[in-house]
Amino acid sequence: YKYLCNEQLASKLIGLLAYQQYMQSKGEKVKVDKAIRPIIHRLTNHQNKHQLWSWWGNSENTSFWMSAHILRALKMAQDAGYPVELNLNGLKVEYAHTRPYRGMKLEDIEILHALHEWKVEADYSSAVRLLEPFVRQLEQKEDSLANRNKYYRPLSYLKEKLLLWEIKQQVDSVNVGDSVRPYLKKDMLEGVYCDD
């Protein structure tokens, strides 16, 4: 993590938290607090005037992917018991109103999911209804490419679907088990995982 841009800070934080959790599961203590706390402080101070993040410092050039990555890292830190003083007050997402002006992107799913985890006010149901057909359209394009070229391995957008299904299940109390079932696989030890 040579450059200490926001992406590298968040990635380092995730790595340190995962290492700490792993060592604790083995019953060993590890001293990473001195490394974790300054990263949390730095990331929270790098929040820009839009209450999100860019690649460097607190630049106004907001990156939604970057913001989602940082929000996930800070949520992991908070869940691990670290104080995270994050200013999301007044951040309200009006995705249905802004989408016509900027189009739809896959990173929208990641930022909506991250904001949902932080309980930011938004009409998540409408956003999911807009994004699910978008993902299906991308899948159809991939299938079309696969039909034309037998060596082409199409993307299934499983990650994006799982994020949308999680929001849908929590916000609309919709059972998404039937949607997930085709992706469930078992390993040699009967452990369950998702794969496309």
Regions found by a protein language model. Give the residues of each.
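Large, well-folded core regions of big proteins
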Residues: 1-196
